[in-house]
Amino acid sequence: MRILDYCRALSQTSLVALLAFAGISSASGVDLKVKRVQLDNGLTVLLHENTQSPTVACRLFYATGSVHEKQGSTGLAHMLEHMLFKGTQKVGITDSVQDGKFLAQEDNLQKLIRGAEVKGDTLSLKGYKARHDSILEEHRKLFVKDELWEAYLKAGGTGLNAYTTDLVTAYFVTLPRNKVELFFWLESDRMQNAVLREFYPERDVVREERRMRYDDSPTGRYFETLEATFYEAFPYRNPTIGYPSEIMHLTREKAAEHYRKYYKPNNAILVLAGDFKADSLMPLIQKYFATVPRGEDFEPITQQEPEQVGEKRLVVRRSDSKPRVDILFHTPGVPNPDLFALDIMESVLNGRAGRLYRRLVEKEQVAVSTDAGNAVKKYYSSFELEAILQEGQTPEKAEALLWEELERLKKEPVSERELQKVRNQLYASKASALADMESVASMLAYYEIYGDYTLVNRWLEEVSKVTPAQVQAVAQKYFQKKLQTVGWFIPAEK
């Protein structure tokens, strides 16, 4: 598993992986027919018709994630994702008026609880918490538990879920073609009428999720710290789930502010891929979404990652470690022509037939597995290498062998035969992938957020143009020891 994939989940997808979702019509490019419409309120709609299955993959992506969080509020975007399943003014509640009164009481008690915690007033704290729990218990009598989930399931929905990355918060489900209107109704309602019920109990759930995935995981803190080492200033350094102390200081008020700012049609992308006629669906999309008010335009992210001035190293020792070596390099964000050559290098190095596996696993028997990834993103990207060590092998040797393969890319042009083999692999992966409408829908949403969904129809052509000389030049440009960030996760010293 790639390091940044671990820490940022789905956000760290390479161009190769993203475009493996798409089919190809020829050896020169992808031919994905997409209709793009933008409503007057700014909502972007992408529609791809495919009749192979009587279903429609539905996606609603908001261009907001951990990079948009204020200092001291890491985990807020992820927390809000959880809250969007608690219902709206119409969904999940039997009495919206009483609902509002209970929420106000709970918010007031939380302020008293925070004040007592600051003062160290344990007696008052105990009383406030008991009162809060009592009010919440009464409040829950008004809830219609999991009403949104049940509505989708009763309509034949599958794959209902959501996720948060550093760049997006995504909500998705696949529905029978005659039930897509339900998606429009529920999601347009969530876009403007969400009610953040049970915020503080859910905050405890998220804190426990963090403990299991990071704090108690042998590699969790290592990956988190490595990423914070790799990024000096840009908010990609922060974990999407948030830091423990900051999670526990998130408030319903902060989450509501984030919701009101970013959950707006002009910051959202609606994608449908499957069995429908675009001309028939557009009136329904207009009906449910066109009346949602446009949000205020907010300032783009201006924070920049400073140029790396020297090699960085992180060594983490644990008694329960599975030894590994990771090397990371900064690369440009989308769009940049160097990314196509880096995609080629990923394929040259990666896989059981790739150079890293053949060298470190089969020949030298230093590692049990290897990986290489061109982790492409908006703003900044990274190229990553990893080796999971054989028992008794040293990180010094593994790192040296990884560097020998990088130096080989820098000094020796990739042969035309090897380059054509990589191209053939990429062509083959595209030829069958168009069958997955769920992946096609997600791919289109990501590329639109990256700035241009049409890249899916140009990527293969661009990769086909990459020459051995270009691969060599790009390798020389980015793979420098003074620009590397190295991580060792090794056993504790006895």
Residue ranges of predicted features:
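Proteolytic maturation boundary segments
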Residues: L4, S25-L47, I269, K277-R317, ...
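Bacterial N-terminal signal peptides
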Residues: S11-G23
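M16 family metallopeptidases and their MPP-like homologs
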Residues: H48, S53-E69, L76-A77, I93-D189, ...
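An aromatic/glycine/proline-enriched structural segment found at the starts
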Residues: R190-E198, R207, R211-D215, F230-I241, ...
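N-terminal secretory signal peptides that target proteins for export/translocation
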Residues: M1-A9
